[in-house]
Amino acid sequence: MKGLKRTHRCTEISTANIGETVTLMGWVQKSRNKGGIIFVDLRDRSGIVQLIFENGSIDAKGFEKATKLRSEFVIAVTGVVEARSGAVNNNLKTGEIEVRANGLRILAEAETPPFPIEENSKTKEDLRLKYRFLDLRRPDIQRNLMMRSQVTTLTRQFMANEGFLEIETPMLTKSTPEGARDYLVPSRIHPGNFYALPQSPQLFKQLLMCSGYDRYIQIARCFRDEDLRADRQPEFTQIDMELSFVDVDDVIDVNERLLAYLFKQVLDVDVKLPIQRMTWQDAMDRFGSDKPDLRFGMELQNVSEVVRGCEFAVFKNALEAGGTVRGINAKGQGSMPRKKIDKLVEFAKDYGAKGLAYIAIHEDGTVKSSFAKFMTEDEMSRLVEAMDGQAGDLL
């Protein structure tokens, strides 16, 4: 690196820099040798720019080095920014320009990587994790981490403007049992005793409120010794906050405005405030989930009172046990084949249900049901009406 200093990241140059001499450093994405001219895609965290090595533009020694370039070589290159001589590449931020190299230094050679360093890799996860340092070079992974960094920075700015103080709380502390087991760290100066890593800063932030700090914020690392699930990890980071002299609406208001600010700044998406609110019970009643996707149109419908008194044992037993009978109207699915319905039944069983009862309403208005013989025609008609069943629907 002696005598070299990077002047730009790869995508920091544009048509405004045409004619300028720049020094770039990064990884070779790919190299194409066309005989007297070599094209190289140079990559850093900002993106890709095309380099040209050509006899006459670079000395013979430099051109010889360029012939040896392979994927993931780390290089430093000096050259002049030019408008692309060939077709513009609209898929690249730097697609209108290229850098004609007049100097090259190979900073590190590379063996053939175990998988392509490219976006949306199809490589198996265990291989990617084995070579995690290579996986982290992939553009989609880098974008995720850069977005995370941006969100963290913007959160700190927003909360500071709202009067919050960022205060770090202890990592080595006594156990404060919450929803999982603690991770324990043995104490050197107190043999036989252990520190517990925090499951959350809950007690500390409450003490801060008692101490008069009024508004606290921390990008807090938390540790929970529990089984992995899609939304559970042994260590995770959360935006942790506490406020004094407020009610629940004040807390919701701050969080809504924070989310709206982040969506606008990071994704340029406008979030309409106030955000729609829903009680936990309403979410469970309508969607069967405490984190429903409101775009999902097939809401659960409670038809317990409609079927109360019918002789269908499944409904009757559920109601007598204090349960409910609920259904979904799958619009336009009345002609679904029996084989596919059977697959849905098995799917429901996988998640703890004993089965599914269905009503198919044909286009001619006739009804086919798995339990029709246990209900009168009037009971079936009232059930279809309660679920807004129309010709072509599957209930």
Where are each of the predicted segments found?
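Class II aminoacyl-tRNA synthetase catalytic cores and aaRS-like
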Residues: 1-395
